[in-house]
Regions:
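An aromatic- and histidine-rich active-site surface loop
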Residues: 65, 80-105
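N-terminal beta-loop-helix "entrance" segment that forms/cooperates
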Residues: 43-61
């Protein structure tokens, strides 16, 4: 039996760099043949113009996302969770909560930042402190 891995990724739509990388991971035959893999879309934005904006609809999507992640990890008990969070802005804090919940539940978590936001936010003490968590 192969290892269970849960991938929590940004997937299109909307189409942007991190979402395309997530799609490549989701569709990888090598990953699929090597692991018992599951994917969850981390995105709460429905379009490019929705990125960076706050709305009740996105808040509701986020609450439903947290509930979905909880149920999936409880049902499949993955040996590893691979997540591609945002590296800055409000979305960083949204994704940070997901990572912390998974860690509190006892799961091994690999955090992979795809964008260049880490260098832009690393000089800010709050982000720098949270990056190390």
């Amino acid at each position: 039996m192969s290892s269970k891995i849960l991938f929590i990724l940004h997937l299109p739509p909307p189409i942007h760099g991190a979402a395309m990388m997530g799609k490549y991971i989701q569709e990888s035959e090598l990953i699929d043949s090597s692991f018992d893999s599951y994917c969850i879309n981390l995105a709460t934005a429905g379009s490019l113009s929705d990125i960076g904006r706050t709305s009740f609809k996105k808040l509701l999507r986020y609450v439903l996302l947290l509930k979905h992640i909880y149920h999936v990890v409880r049902d499949i008990h993955p040996e590893l969770v691979y997540i591609t969070p945002n590296a800055g802005g409000k979305a960083f804090f949204k994704d940070f909560i997901v990572v912390q919940i998974l860690k509190c539940m006892g799961y091994k978590v690999i955090v992979h930042y795809h964008n260049k936001g880490v260098s832009a936010y690393q000089s800010k003490w709050v982000y720098n402190f949270l990056f190390s968590r």
